């Protein structure tokens, strides 16, 4: 009986194949999987690296930004030669150089209510590494509507958070944060800073969650928020619950279609 793997693949993925929890069947699942990453920045960089190395067959990666000097302290997909170039294109080149066995699809356009459903509909799992609230709510709502599992991660200064959202099986992002903070209340990484190695830890945890979702193995962070304090080297898990009045995923949902998320986040000034 012929092997489903090429000789090169057997060599490349041998450390996976010998794991009973992965094996040949699991590696085939990874090779057939399609994962979409929102952002090729701090969180998207380590997540994309490890998903590509693991052999995820198709990786879509969306980022409308260009590489800046200040990104290089933490966004390891990019190097000095990429300054001024599209992050999505830079990511594609880096990942395909790491693993020519996979396909990387770059999306240089900004994700909006008009295009996101069509873009992510054919992907199996979504990984959110966005650095702004409008995109986080947009991605959450789109994943709920399409019933796509979602790994959400965020970083701020020395702290990171990760949760895994499986629509209608556990809480969504809106169950955790029903409304965004007023604009300006939470400073950006540009304003507050971020420890360069922090997204490496958080993004790698997100990639681990995605691999477990694909394999159907282990316990995922569904209904749990993992909080990492890098300054004090402390991990803690907090239980989170479905909001019975969630406007998107509850029986009383009032949001039935994607909205203007910039306006939604701006509208909560002073609320």
Placement of each model-derived feature along the sequence:
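Adenine nucleotide-associated cytosolic modules
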Residues: 1-271
